């Protein structure tokens, strides 16, 4: 093989053109298997349908504002773009929930790594907490953000009397 290529390369340019007119290329790329490719699933598959809302209990007129995203599978042996998105979303540590907005830019990233993560809506039974209440909140495994109400010392003294 190397001898054939060497003899073709060492010939003058005029003879090289005549020698390669009827010759097909020696390297065929049709049989090469590319392990990872980006998703080519059409966007229509990801659009919500009325059946989905009935099945999962969502409301299309009042969508939830925040997602709880948890990584449930490893990123080992996954392509670099999935690892980059996991890092951007702050999901390097498995089974640690992160809160993200329900906006199209974040949803596009979540769609790429949907097979590695679990997404739940964040439920706010007591409403959205204020800045002062953020230190007194607790995120339950059911997806509820509960605000713990602290008692003021004046209230405690009034209750003792």
UniProtKB/Swiss-Prot annotation:
One of its GO terms (cellular component) is mitochondrial large ribosomal subunit. Belongs to the universal ribosomal protein uL30 family. GO terms for molecular function: structural constituent of ribosome. Pfam families: Ribosomal_L30. It is found in: Mitochondrion. Component of the mitochondrial ribosome large subunit (39S) which comprises a 16S rRNA and about 50 distinct proteins. Keywords: Mitochondrion, Ribonucleoprotein, Ribosomal protein, Transit peptide. One of its GO terms (biological process) is translation. The keyword Transit peptide applies. InterPro entries: Ribo_uL30_ferredoxin-like_sf, Ribosomal_uL30_bac-type, Ribosomal_uL30_ferredoxin-like. PANTHER family: LARGE RIBOSOMAL SUBUNIT PROTEIN UL30M, MITOCHONDRIAL RIBOSOMAL PROTEIN L30. The keyword Ribonucleoprotein applies. This is Large ribosomal subunit protein uL30m. Residues 1-34 form a transit peptide.
């Amino acid at each position: 093989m190397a001898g054939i290529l060497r003899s073709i390369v060492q010939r003058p340019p005029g003879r090289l053109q005549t020698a390669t007119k009827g010759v097909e290329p020696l390297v065929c790329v049709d049989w090469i298997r590319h392990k990872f490719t980006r998703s080519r699933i059409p966007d229509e598959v990801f659009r919500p349908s009325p059946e989905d809302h009935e099945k999962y209990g969502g409301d299309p007129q009042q969508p939830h504002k925040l997602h709880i995203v948890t990584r449930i599978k490893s990123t080992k042996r996954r392509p670099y773009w999935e690892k980059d998105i996991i890092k951007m979303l702050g999901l390097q540590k498995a089974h640690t929930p992160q809160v993200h907005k329900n906006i199209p830019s974040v949803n596009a990233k979540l769609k790429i790594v949907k097979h590695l993560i679990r997404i739940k809506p964040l439920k706010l039974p007591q409403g959205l907490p204020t800045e002062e209440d953020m230190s007194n909140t607790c995120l339950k495994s059911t997806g509820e953000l509960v605000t713990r109400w602290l008692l003021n010392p004046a209230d405690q003294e009034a209750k003792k009397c």
